[in-house]
């Protein structure tokens, strides 16, 4: 279920995020709104597209793939998100959600 979230001002100044097009930045912010209190959410691209980009022609699967790539400027080079499965269920973890 979507939640009201506050984003820190530094969210928009992330060197790794700013190299992506605005659509990817909106997607990343939208994932934060969809996540639970631990930064996890169901990996359901069709549902996420309907929630985050209801009126836009956007390839959400491609956007999620971009966010899974290692960061260029971060010392640890960790991605923004990790996609994983538990049994038959698929999930997304936002890496820096709790920081």
Residue ranges of predicted features:
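Positively charged, structured surface patches that bind polyanionic biopolymers
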Residues: 1-86, 93-99
């Amino acid at each position: 279920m979507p939640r009201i979230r506050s984003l820190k001002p530094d969210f928009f100044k992330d060197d790794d995020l700013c190299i992506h097009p605005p659509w990817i930045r909106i997607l990343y912010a939208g994932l934060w709104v969809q996540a639970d209190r631990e930064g996890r959410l169901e990996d359901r691209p069709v549902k996420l597209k309907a929630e985050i980009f209801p009126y836009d022609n956007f390839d959400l699967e491609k956007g999620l793939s971009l966010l899974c790539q290692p960061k260029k400027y971060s010392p640890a080079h960790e991605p923004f998100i990790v996609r994983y499965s538990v049994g038959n269920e698929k999930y997304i973890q936002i890496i820096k959600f709790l920081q």
